């Protein structure tokens, strides 16, 4: 098999739902990233085999294709959009790597985009053309069959109850996420990932959801989202707008084009779990991935596990025995945000910039009861 390597990765700063990016369609969120890669790597961009993007709540119509055309890329580049719900961005990266492995191509752009602020309203179609009732709006897409399809909040509560995760534990983890994200934004670690761009004439270069002044006392005052529950808006991620792009390339082609550093794709795993406990999807996914490579969690230097809810991250950490000092060391989605279709690609982007970590894992729990995970190693091409 051919060896895929990631030689470039960038994201925009993530906006809050209804925040500074609320007026921008997904294509506009991607455009500065496409332009950046075109400016920085014109030869690479002229040789692209495909663009593979994750997207979950967009307008449909193959957003990857439309976005690359809007950005002025060659019409000969096809484009494909992937929907594995919030695992879509990670799946896009995995699929690009698999395409390189198989020899189907040598250079791909992978990533994801989401605008929760611009997500279209969806209406149930009437059974009869003569139906006169008011239209029924879908609050969200169904993830599983009726009776086994909890809301995200219900699923997070299910995990908290099953694995005995207390309210205090969840609040503590959320506080940790904001503190680490704030620290690593200020020291320049997270800033490496972000491509600043102008929004209504002003530079946008910091994630809107990070709360550096957040306290445990403030978190403790928040009411549970469900009666007698433990999940709150404070120990959950926000809805966000954002975009991420990475360049995936065959190793020898990367050397030919002068690239000498990045991360190489080793393997991946995707596993189904009970939809009621979707948040612990990372557990079987990571276990399967490690078993395939004959590794243990002790062989992994850093793990990026998407923070949809504190409860599911804590449960997954405990079940996988991940040392806390290896988990989401720069903070996670509870602080920086969760633009669904882009989040998995953002995890890989973070690993790309953790240059002192050799062997790393990105993993996510996914709506409908799925976990996916990917293993990477630091790559030096010289």
Swiss-Prot record:
This chain belongs to the protein called: Putative acetyl-CoA C-acetyltransferase VraB
Query: Transport: present as a keyword of the record?
Result: no
The gene coding this protein: vraB
Q: Which organism is it from?
A: Staphylococcus epidermidis (strain ATCC 35984 / DSM 28319 / BCRC 17069 / CCUG 31568 / BM 3577 / RP62A)
Gene3D superfamilies recorded: 3.40.47.10
Ranges annotated as spanning the membrane: none
Provide the active-site residues from the annotation. 86, 338
Q: Name one Pfam family in it.
A: Thiolase_C
Q: Which GO terms describe its cellular component?
A: cytoplasm
Biological process (GO) annotations held by this record are: fatty acid beta-oxidation; phenylacetate catabolic process
Source domain of life is Bacteria
GO terms assigned for molecular function: acetyl-CoA C-acyltransferase activity
Lineage summary = Bacteria, Bacillati, Bacillota, Bacilli, Bacillales
């Amino acid at each position: 098999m051919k060896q895929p390597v990631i030689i470039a990765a960038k994201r925009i700063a993530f906006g809050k739902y209804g925040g500074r990016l609320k007026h921008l369609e997904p294509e506009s969120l991607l455009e500065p990233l496409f332009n950046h890669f075109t400016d920085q790597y014109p030869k690479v961009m002229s040789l692209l085999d495909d663009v593979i993007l994750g997207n979950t709540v967009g307008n449909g119509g193959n957003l990857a294709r439309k976005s690359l055309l809007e950005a002025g890329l060659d019409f000969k580049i096809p484009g494909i959009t992937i929907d594995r719900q919030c695992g879509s961005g990670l799946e896009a990266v995995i699929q690009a790597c698999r395409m390189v492995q198989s020899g189907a191509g040598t250079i791909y752009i992978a990533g994801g985009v989401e605008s929760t602020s611009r997500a279209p309203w969806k209406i149930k179609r009437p059974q009869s053309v003569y139906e006169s009732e008011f239209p029924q709006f879908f609050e969200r897409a169904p993830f599983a069959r009726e009776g086994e399809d909890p809301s995200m909040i219900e699923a997070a509560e299910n995990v908290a109850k099953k694995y005995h995760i207390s309210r205090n534990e969840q609040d503590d983890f959320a506080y940790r996420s904001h503190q680490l994200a704030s620290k690593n934004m200020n020291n320049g670690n997270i800033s490496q990932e972000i491509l600043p761009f102008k929004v209504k004439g002003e530079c946008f270069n910091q994630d809107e959801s990070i709360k550096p002044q957040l306290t445990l006392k403030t978190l403790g005052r928040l009411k549970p989202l469900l009666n007698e529950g433990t999940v709150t808006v404070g120990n959950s991620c926000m809805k966000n707008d954002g975009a991420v792009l990475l360049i995936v390339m065959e190793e020898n082609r990367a050397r030919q084009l002068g690239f000498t550093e990045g991360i190489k794709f080793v393997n991946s795993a995707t596993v189904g779990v009970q939809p009621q406990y979707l948040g612990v999807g990372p557990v079987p996914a990571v276990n399967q991935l490690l078993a395939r490579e004959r590794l243990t969690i002790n062989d992994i230097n850093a793990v990026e596990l998407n923070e949809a809810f504190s409860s599911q991250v804590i449960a997954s950490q405990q079940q996988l025995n991940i040392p806390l000092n290896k988990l989401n060391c720069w903070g996670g989605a509870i602080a920086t945000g969760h633009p669904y279709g882009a989040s998995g690609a953002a995890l890989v982007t973070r690993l790309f910039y953790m240059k002192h970590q050799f062997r790393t894992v990105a993993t996510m729990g996914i709506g409908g009861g799925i976990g996916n995970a990917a293993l990477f190693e630091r790559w030096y091409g010289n």
